[in-house]
Structure formats: structure tokens, C-alpha cells
A protein has these predicted regions:
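Membrane-anchoring hydrophobic helices of lipid-metabolizing enzymes
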Residues: 1-81, 86-90, 99, 115-121
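Soluble catalytic domains of membrane acyltransferases
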Residues: 58-167
């Protein structure tokens, strides 16, 4: 069968875990990178995102036009984290490769490929200590002034294809 059942005890359970769930970035990690390599990686990732999102995953986006009128303004998007891989790529197809950022748990930087090649160029790591938390808040403030589009998955855990609200 293609389907399997996932059991949980509370809506805060982490039902999908990475091998490096306790991965921690150094305190001196540079969050915002405005470099030619940054733009190249983002551009290439965006092309892959279109192919993967629409060609492989067959995603259909309803209401895309509502976002396009705000493309030159900064905004936050709150969404359910429902797909292990495509939640990283699909926003690139919706918000553009230049201005898209995502607030993410540091464990994601420990994931092979995505954590090493994509997150360093658009991920905003949630701080694990006060110094890192302040750094994140400053980065968000800077990006807000730059009209960035910031995605937040507030439940902080992947629940495959779950569409309900978890508090």
C-alpha cells in the first residue's frame, strides 16, 4: 500500500525526524547573505522548484493572483508544514527567488543537500540561545525593511499532508 498510518500523542509530536535532529549552528553563523553565489543558488533552486513542484508533485496553487499584487512589498506567510521536501521548494515558485526566506529549526541545516545547499541562502534559523534569538530578530527586521517575503511554519513539525490546525 502507498499509504501508512502515523500515530501521535499530542499535536506537538514530531512525527518526521532527521538523523541530525540536534544539529546546532555556531553563534557566529551569518544569516543574511547578499553575494553572487547566494543569487546563483537561489536562481538555480527556483528552476528546480518549478520542475519538482509542478512536474513531480503535481501541485495546483489556488489564489496565486492574491500574492502577485504584493510582490513589491514585504509580507509574512503562515502555513502548515505538510511536505518534507516540497515545503522548501514550493515557496520559491510563489514568492520569487530574490525575496523568499523561511524561518526554520536548526535541525534542518543538518539535512543532506537541502541543509547544506539551500537553507544557507534563504533560511532563517530559530535561535537555540539568547544570542542566536536576537540575531534572528535582527535579521527579520532587516529583511522586513528590504520587502522580503518570509514564510513561517508555526507548528515547527512536519506532519505529512495534514491540513488541520495544530496549536
Amino acid at each position: 500500500s502507498k499509504h501508512h498510518t502515523i500515530y501521535y500523542n499530542s499535536t506537538t509530536d514530531d512525527v518526521v525526524k532527521s538523523k541530525k535532529q540536534d544539529f546546532t549552528l555556531p553563534d557566529d553563523y551569518q544569516i543574511i547573505k547578499h553575494t553572487p553565489l547566494n543569487y546563483l543558488i537561489r536562481f538555480l533552486a527556483s528552476g528546480f522548484a518549478y520542475l519538482f513542484t509542478y512536474g513531480v508533485m503535481h501541485v495546483k496553487v489556488i489564489g496565486r493572483d492574491k500574492l502577485s499584487k504584493y510582490k513589491d512589498e514585504g509580507y509574512f506567510v503562515y502555513g502548515n508544514h505538510t511536505q518534507m521536501v516540497n515545503d522548501v521548494f514550493m515557496p520559491l515558485t510563489l514568492f520569487g527567488w530574490k525575496n523568499y526566506y523561511a524561518i526554520a529549526n536548526q535541525a534542518n541545516w543538518g539535512i543532506p543537500v537541502i541543509g547544506k545547499t539551500l537553507l544557507p541562502y534563504g533560511g532563517l534559523p530559530v535561535g537555540k540561545n539568547i544570542k542566536q534569538a536576537i540575531k534572528l530578530l535582527k535579521a527579520v527586521k532587516t529583511l522586513t525593511k528590504e520587502n522580503a517575503h518570509i514564510v513561517i511554519y508555526p507548528e515547527a513539525h512536519v506532519w505529512p499532508y495534514y491540513t488541520g490546525i495544530r496549536l
